[in-house]
């Protein structure tokens, strides 16, 4: 079955999907007596059903949904919101945290930082319930076995909050991600760190300013096979400068995508026609550094790129088009413009090395009417744009 055939079979409506997430998160947290539901402390992407998505947070639900559509998502599992809920109840932290957050004066930066540090210390100081820890360890061992690296698989441990990746809330980057984590003990420790990152000063302030109720927000954690990225970046299925949905914009650089996402390098930038997949403009930058794995010391390091390679495009024309094809498929899957993180895995053969790390709704222009350049858009382009974007046409 082709990707198109897969996507055309009952594509989910992302807006109704995320609305149901919020309702389910709240219900599942405040009714922990449903023991059969709480037993789902971890779920592998491939085994998660749509009714399980409320347990996975925004990032985790998106990865599970794309994995179910046979898109190229690295194998992994989620430590569910029920594991986090069980931890809070077993440690008697929920009421304490809620009361402390309610008292925070976000206008007082020093006080916000102090309260944030205290809350995170409370979480980091408490042990996981024995059953939760046992399930997480078992799931990591299964993941290692699936990839043929018993006990030694490097993984990314990534926060997946329930207010994350919503169409009307740009929540990205508010919690923590940890790369090249190896071993059961380290996975357990970094899961706890992800839970604690729900209460960074930045995240508390963001929720307060966005009127997001604290008791509506829970944390899932993604544990996913680490990609040894040759090249990585971001693809937007509209032009972020003007909202034009007939274009795809790609930012890319050498190595892991953190250099692009963090702004550490000025990435190569490609503007592509979404219909014809023609590269309209390629702006190639001097990319001085890259993030790469240090396999010996089990960490990610930043290293200088040799001058010749730094000045070269990090994507060929064919690779740019391959990124765009997948980006179009993902946009069709979710039926709204997407902000996609991707990588080319150096350990896989060319043509089979494209991997999806994350996709979330674009949160700026989807709330507005897209603008176009009347002086450059032909009548046919306008017709094609309407045919491609029925949602935009109804606005």
Describe the predicted segments one by one.
Residues 38-220, 311-318, 325-326, 331-335, ...:
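N-terminal beta-alpha lobe that positions the nucleotide/phosphoryl donor
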Residues 2-8:
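Extreme N-terminal basic, low-complexity initiation segments
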Residues 13, 27-38:
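Short, Lys/Arg-enriched N-terminal segments with co-localized hydrophobic residues
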Residues 174-276:
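NTP-handling and nucleic-acid-processing catalytic cores
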Residues 16-20, 24-28:
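Intrinsic disorder/low-complexity segments
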